[in-house]
């Protein structure tokens, strides 16, 4: 693992993030090949994100690659302060561990399965994982204790699911769309930097 990968994927405290000048945000990255979702506290990700969030390598949920061309930002979660952003990140990681390790059999019962009892897929892509990540994001924000407001910036607005589900939360949540990308790798970095600049205005 490179030193850069170690640096960007290490867990960060609220104090560190604030001192380093990062906005109180977290990032959900979608795997274009398999539908898996990875969480990051920084607008980057590394090997440790993979190792800590994908604990159980198996045929239905193989440990994903770090290749930059297969990950795209699905959602940028803009929390009101760094403590809230860290709490939501920790909640997401705990829910992932519960789904994949502690209560895997129970979680499987609620997933769309094919006639062989496997998580439904098309090619290698399993939409269940992105749907679960959105559900877990809602739960994580709800349990964070945040007073809001929270802004969710989506890759596509339809990924948020039903707006009425988000309106159940007892805090102000705004939804908007990320700018459309051309060259995914180059433009995505520029777009995330632009979001950071907008937050400082």
UniProtKB/Swiss-Prot annotation:
Its main location: nucleus. GO terms for cellular component: mitochondrial large ribosomal subunit; nucleus. It comes from the Eukaryota. Pfam families: Mhr1. GO terms for biological process: cellular response to oxidative stress; mitochondrial genome maintenance; positive regulation of mitochondrial DNA replication; regulation of DNA-templated transcription. InterPro entries: Ribosomal_mL67 (IPR024629). The keyword Transcription applies. GO terms for molecular function: DNA strand exchange activity; single-stranded DNA binding; structural constituent of ribosome. It is found in: Nucleus; Mitochondrion. Keywords: Mitochondrion, Nucleus, Ribonucleoprotein, Ribosomal protein, Transcription, Transcription regulation. Belongs to the mitochondrion-specific ribosomal protein mL67 family. Transcription factor involved in regulation of RNA polymerase II-dependent transcription. Also involved in regulation of mitochondrial DNA recombination, maintenance and repair, and generation of homoplasmic cells. This is Large ribosomal subunit protein mL67. The gene is MHR1.
């Amino acid at each position: 693992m490179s030193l850069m990968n170690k640096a960007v994927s290490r867990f960060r405290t609220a104090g560190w993030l604030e001192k380093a000048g990062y906005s109180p945000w977290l990032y959900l990255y979608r795997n274009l090949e398999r539908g898996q979702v990875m969480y990051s506290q920084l607008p980057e990700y590394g090997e440790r994100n993979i190792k800590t969030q994908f604990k159980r390598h198996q045929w239905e949920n193989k440990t994903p690659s770090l290749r930059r061309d297969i990950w795209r930002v699905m959602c940028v979660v803009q929390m009101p302060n760094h403590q809230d952003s860290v709490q939501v990140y920790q909640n997401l990681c705990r829910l992932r561990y519960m789904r994949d390790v502690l209560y895997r059999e129970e979680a499987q019962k609620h997933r769309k399965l094919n006639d062989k009892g496997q998580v439904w897929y098309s090619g290698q892509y399993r939409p269940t994982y992105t749907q679960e990540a959105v559900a877990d994001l809602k739960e994580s924000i709800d349990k964070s204790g945040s007073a809001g407001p929270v802004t969710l910036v989506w890759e596509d607005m339809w990924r948020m699911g039903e707006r009425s589900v988000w309106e159940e939360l007892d805090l102000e949540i705004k939804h908007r769309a990320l700018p459309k990308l051309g060259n995914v790798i180059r433009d995505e970095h520029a777009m995330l930097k632009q979001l950071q600049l907008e937050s400082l205005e």
